[in-house]
């Protein structure tokens, strides 16, 4: 009897997550059966929930808001990009029973921009809005693409300054932003409640791409704001979601899915 490999995504809330549908599409490409669920861990109960999942046969897990930094603390070892980010979105069970933490958010974002949308990051000026775990996780990979400049802005400027020092990028107060950006990436949590970041509409003049890390309806307020104020192209984070999921799947199973048909499949749902 063949044992079906079990995976899950931890978050709170997590009922909205599209990860199960995405990973089932990857499994169809590989020609295997997997089980992929959702676990809403209690705040303060993440470590216990992870322990129970792996002790009862779990093979790998994704981690979303608000547990990515807790997952980093929980892992026994890390990839270089997870260490740089200080946040983990992928837990891999090793043969020795230890957990390896990785962060595939940056790969998902950069692949969506450069491969799916065919927009180069190299030599571009990038603005990151927000300074939470989502933004922190993508900075190391964005830097690998050698942009001309990365600027970070956050509602609480001190948090932006902290990340700027950590990663060797620039921090600018939101109120002082005035344009000159090729790519603007919104990683604030405000999109989840329909709130726009407190930035001037002028920042979108001559912007090649405005990108929101969230996907679906939650991204529309920011994308409409960007497009109506001059952004040449706008995108939600569906491609990033599928891309980071594909990288996680590859780490667990050694099979690299084709993300393009899965992005189209998810758009059609």
From Swiss-Prot:
Q: What is the source species? A: Neisseria cinerea
Q: What is the lineage of its organism?
A: Bacteria, Pseudomonadati, Pseudomonadota, Betaproteobacteria, Neisseriales
Family, similarity comment: Belongs to the shikimate dehydrogenase family.
Catalyzed reactions per annotation: shikimate + NADP(+) = 3-dehydroshikimate + NADPH + H(+)
CDD domains cross-referenced by the UniProt entry: NAD_bind_Shikimate_DH (cd01065)
Instruction: Give UniProt keywords alphabetically.
Output: Amino-acid biosynthesis, Aromatic amino acid biosynthesis, NADP, Oxidoreductase
Gene3D superfamilies with a match to the protein in the record: Leucine Dehydrogenase, chain A, domain 1, NAD(P)-binding Rossmann-like Domain
* Residues holding NADP(+): 80, 130-134, 154-159, 213, 237
> Which GO cellular component terms are attached?
cytosol
Protein name as annotated:
Shikimate dehydrogenase (NADP(+))
Q: Where does shikimate bind?
A: 17-19, 64, 89, 105, 215
